[in-house]
Structures are given as structure tokens and as C-alpha cells.
């Protein structure tokens, strides 16, 4: 394996970390609520803190990579994530978990912006599309695995069968007995340290941003924001990410409150299959988009998503579980299609427009917060 292929492998590992850390919050949310005795409104501040960071950091991250390059930017991103996770390990309280999630969110937002051009430079233009699909598969696999890892860890930490498991006994020793889920933050801290060490020793190729990847000037943003379609596509990204995270964060708690489903059992499994079916939908979407018009595909999948959600909200237990999971498939193509349609709607300033659209990931903070408030 040549040197650049090792870098591509490292980037895929970073995608795995981003996905696992980002999407573990949903299945963990009922446990956090129970541990801290939170109201749903206070609980809603948890995903709000994390995705608020995405909204704040998306545009500055592009400027940071232009100024400092890929390697330094990666080190900054993982340092922020390390500080966030480490802070909660030391001070496991509700106010600190909000601060921790915000800091980790800043790091994850930076990473997503940095590794796209880095993947292109390391893997080459010819393999870029293939590597992006591979990254999407890795991202989906991590999302699918995270609820199962959480459920398995909770069974070990709260059970009596861990006497011969050194690592579990070690986690029990450093984790507050009433907060077994917080052991994941210790694991995240270790992972972030490992990534910092590895990245510090790796020589990355110089990242030359294309014009459509550069952050752009203030004037570029002003010019874009005067255009009606830019605002509509921005709102579309807010709506999509808000729907995705609203479902992922609240479905387990919904199933627990209205159907008595265990968050560590069927609730976690439902969240896992939500992400798993989303990944399958993304792969099928690569084929379907070649056969039918993107706008038509978006309309069809949107109608299926509305139907799935209605069944999930009002159906009996087993039907609701299946419908919530199927929501992942029905919204799977929306982000990529909306993003592509948006960029194709303008003939210049694509880098600045991408920054505006990525800021719309703030919808992952806004919509779940509204759901919690309701």
C-alpha cells in the first residue's frame, strides 16, 4: 500500500469517528435525561449545543484550512474535541455536558470541512468519487454500529458478568455509578488522543483548494444572500438536517414514553436501523439519480418520508418501530440532492455557497430543540 493510500485509510477512520461521535447522542439521550432528571426542554439543549457548533464553525473552518493547511487544521479540530470530552470526564455535570458537546461539535464540524479536499488530494481526482462513496459507507457503518456499542457497553457496566473483563472493571472504577453512559466520553478522550498522535506523525499532501472549495469573501456572501433560491436551498438544508437529527435524537425516547420500549434494547436497535437503512438508501440513490430527474426523486422520497413518519407517530408499537427505522431510508437521498441542486442553481461563488449550506446544519440544533420544547 503506497503512502497516499495510508492517508486515505486514515481519512476513512476520521469519517468513522465523526459519525460515531455525532450519532451516538440519539440513543444516549434517554439515559442522560434519566441520570440528570431533565425535562424534555432541558434535554433539547443537548443536541442544540452540539449542532449549534456546526452552524457557527462551518464557514470559519474553510478559512482555517486556507490559512493553516490540512494537518494543522486536523490537529486543531481533534484538540477541540479532546478538550470537550476530557472536560466532561473530569466534571460530569449537566452544564459541563452542554459545554462538552459544543466543543466536540466545533471539532467535528471542522473535520467535515477539512477532510473533503484532503481526500481529493490524497486519493487523486480519478478516485475521488469512489473514495467519497467509500467514506459514505464507512460513515453509515459507524452510525449503524454506535447504538449497538452503547447498548452492549451499558449491559456490561450495569451487569454482574464483568468481573473478568479488565477494561470494563477499569471503566466502572472511573465512571460515576449513576452515569454509566458517561464512560463513552472517556473512550472518546482516548480516541481523540490517539488521532492527535497519529496525525502529528503523518505527512499530509498540501491541500490546494479549488475555487469551488474556497470560503470566499464577505462580498461573495452578500451577493449570494440577495438571491431567493439561495435562501430557499439554505432553508431546505435546515429542514433536512433538523428532520434527520430530530428523528435520530427523539425516536428512542418517543418509543420509550408511548410504547414502553427499552432505550438500551429495541430503542437502540431502531436508531441503528434508521442509520443502516439511510446508508442503504444513499447507495441506491447513486443508481436512481441516474434514471430519474433529481427534483422528481426528491418529491417522491419526501412523500414517502411523510407517510413513514405519520405511521411511526400514530401506529402500534411494532409498526412504529419499523416505520421509524424506514424513515432513514426515505430521507436518505435528500441532503445530497438538495446540495447538488443548490450548487447547480448558481454559476459562481460555489465555495461560499457551500459554506452557507453547511451553516444550515444548524437545523440539527434548531428542530430537535423545538421538538423537545413541544
Task: Kindly give the residue locations of the regions a language model identified.
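Glycine-rich segments within core transmembrane alpha-helices of 12-TM secondary carriers
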Residues: 127-161, 355-368
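Helix-breaking motifs and short loop linkers at transmembrane-helix boundaries and internal kinks
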Residues: 37, 69, 90-95, 314-316, ...
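Conserved MFS/SLC helix-loop-helix module at the cytosolic interface between two early adjacent transmembrane helices
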Residues: 56-95
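Extracytoplasmic gate region of multi-pass secondary transporters
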Residues: 25-26, 146-147, 154-155, 222-273
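C-terminal membrane-cytosol helix-exit motif in multi-pass small-molecule transporters
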Residues: 150-162, 176, 186-211
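Intracellular juxtamembrane helix-capping segments at the cytosolic ends
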Residues: 110-124, 332-347
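Central cavity-lining transmembrane alpha-helices of secondary-active solute carriers
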Residues: 45-63, 272-284, 363
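Extracytoplasmic
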Residues: 6-40, 58-61, 116, 146, ...
Amino acid at each position: 500500500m503506497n503512502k497516499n493510500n495510508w492517508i486515505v485509510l486514515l481519512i476513512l477512520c476520521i469519517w468513522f469517528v465523526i459519525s460515531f461521535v455525532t450519532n451516538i447522542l440519539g440513543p444516549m439521550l434517554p439515559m442522560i435525561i434519566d441520570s440528570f432528571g431533565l425535562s424534555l426542554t432541558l434535554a433539547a439543549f443537548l443536541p442544540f449545543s452540539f449542532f449549534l457548533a456546526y452552524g457557527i464553525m462551518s464557514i470559519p473552518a474553510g478559512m482555517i484550512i486556507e490559512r493553516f493547511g490540512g494537518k494543522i487544521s486536523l490537529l486543531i479540530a481533534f484538540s477541540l474535541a479532546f478538550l470537550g470530552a476530557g472536560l466532561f470526564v473530569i466534571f460530569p455535570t449537566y452544564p459541563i455536558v452542554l459545554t462538552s458537546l459544543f466543543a466536540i461539535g466545533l471539532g467535528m464540524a471542522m473535520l467535515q470541512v477539512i477532510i473533503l479536499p484532503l481526500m481529493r488530494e490524497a486519493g487523486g481526482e480519478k478516485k475521488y468519487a469512489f473514495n467519497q462513496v467509500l467514506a459514505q459507507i464507512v460513515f453509515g457503518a459507524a452510525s449503524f454500529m454506535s447504538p449497538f456499542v452503547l447498548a452492549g457497553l451499558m449491559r456490561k457496566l450495569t451487569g454482574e458478568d464483568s468481573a473478568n473483563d479488565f477494561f470494563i472493571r477499569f471503566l466502572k472504577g472511573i465512571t460515576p455509578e449513576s452515569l454509566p453512559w458517561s464512560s463513552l466520553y472517556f473512550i472518546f478522550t482516548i480516541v481523540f488522543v490517539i488521532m492527535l498522535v497519529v496525525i502529528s506523525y503523518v505527512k499530509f499532501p498540501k491541500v490546494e483548494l479549488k475555487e469551488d472549495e474556497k470560503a470566499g469573501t464577505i462580498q461573495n456572501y452578500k451577493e449570494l444572500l440577495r438571491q431567493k433560491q439561495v435562501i430557499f436551498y439554505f432553508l431546505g438544508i435546515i429542514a433536512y438536517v433538523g428532520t434527520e437529527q430530530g428523528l435520530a435524537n427523539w425516536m428512542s425516547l418517543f418509543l420509550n414514553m408511548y410504547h414502553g420500549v427499552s432505550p438500551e434494547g429495541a430503542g437502540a436497535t431502531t436508531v441503528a436501523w434508521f442509520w443502516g437503512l439511510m446508508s442503504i438508501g444513499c447507495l441506491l440513490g447513486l443508481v436512481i439519480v441516474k434514471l430519474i430527474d433529481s427534483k422528481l426523486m426528491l418529491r417522491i422520497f419526501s412523500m414517502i418520508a411523510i407517510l413513514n413518519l405519520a405511521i411511526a407517530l400514530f401506529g402500534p408499537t411494532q409498526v412504529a418501530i419499523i416505520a421509524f427505522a424506514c424513515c432513514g431510508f426515505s430521507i436518505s437521498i435528500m441532503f445530497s440532492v438538495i446540495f447538488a441542486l443548490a450548487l447547480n442553481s448558481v454559476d459562481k461563488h460555489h465555495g461560499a455557497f457551500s459554506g452557507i449550506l453547511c451553516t444550515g446544519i444548524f437545523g440539527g440544533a434548531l428542530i430537535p430543540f423545538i421538538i423537545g420544547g413541544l
